[in-house]
Design a protein with these regions (language model features):
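Residues within mature, well-folded domains
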Residues: 2-120
Length: 120
């Protein structure tokens, strides 16, 4: 569980991020363009209308923390953002699915989106 005031040191959007065994943790309503602005282009796209997922970002967030003994370390939080059974890549405002190993994935996605909004 992440602290309320956690920071994100790094965000990696890459095809090699291991998302095996992740599952739906939450959702975020935003646009395709905003996701591309924040995370870059999707790491996977598929135009086939019969596929369950047409656009997906595989993400790994590096979250630093200090443990109880004062030693600095970091968590790697894996997240995915994807559409589900739309038959196309949504470009309008859409309720995107957030996958991960736990709810930290949702926290990191929201935090990163908020960081970009605050900088504008």
């Amino acid at each position: 569980m992440l602290d309320n005031d956690f920071k994100i040191a790094n965000t990696l959007a890459c095809e090699t991020v291991d998302i095996n065994m992740t599952c739906l943790q939450g959702k975020v309503t935003t646009t395709y363009d905003e996701l591309c602005e924040v995370f870059g282009y999707p790491t996977m796209t598929d135009g086939d209308p019969y596929e369950k997922v047409n656009a997906q970002w595989k993400l790994e967030f590096t979250v630093p923390f200090t443990d109880d003994t004062g030693i600095e370390d970091f968590h790697n939080v894996v997240a995915t953002i994807y559409n589900w059974k739309t038959g196309y890549i949504p470009t309008e405002e859409y309720e995107w699915h957030i996958g991960g190993f736990n709810k930290d994935a949702v926290d990191c996605v929201y935090k990163k989106l908020d960081m970009v909004e605050e900088a504008v």
